[in-house]
């Protein structure tokens, strides 16, 4: 079964709320295919603040689990308060997440598609107009 990879995007945004609300509406079949690139601890703390309960599982690889939990491929992130991550850590997290997503998406045998949640473009260091241009540059 091919996987769908979702990049959580900006840690200071409403993306975790969108992810949770969308997750609840998915069928069990689709939930088995989805892997989220994010920071496991950040997501758990954001869900707690928002009052959301979801089964979250930390995985190292997209073939590691095949259940209906929200499977998180962890990307390191230093933070003290969820939704208030400093700009330097946010930029590094976003770029690391995009790079991991790109790497996984190149494996066409295992990955059906890649979805990225919104990011503030300033975290791309004004070198790219957006995520599409960032990925296009990586494919040159």
Where are these regions (language model features)?
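Contiguous, glycine/small-aliphatic-enriched amphipathic segments in soluble metabolic enzymes
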Residues: 1-139
């Amino acid at each position: 079964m091919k996987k769908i990879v979702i990049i959580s995007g900006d840690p200071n945004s409403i993306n975790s709320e969108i992810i949770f609300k969308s997750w609840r509406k998915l069928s069990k079949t689709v939930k088995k295919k989805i892997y989220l690139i994010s920071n496991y601890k950040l997501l758990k703390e954001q869900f707690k603040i928002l009052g959301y309960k979801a089964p979250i599982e930390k995985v190292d690889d997209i073939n590691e689990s095949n259940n209906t939990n929200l499977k998180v491929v962890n990307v390191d992130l230093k933070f003290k308060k969820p939704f208030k991550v400093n700009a330097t850590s946010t930029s590094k997290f976003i770029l690391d997440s995009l790079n991991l997503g790109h790497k996984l998406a190149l494996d066409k045998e295992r990955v059906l598609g890649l979805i990225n949640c919104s990011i503030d473009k300033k975290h791309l260091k004004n070198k790219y107009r957006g995520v599409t241009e960032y990925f296009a540059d990586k494919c040159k």
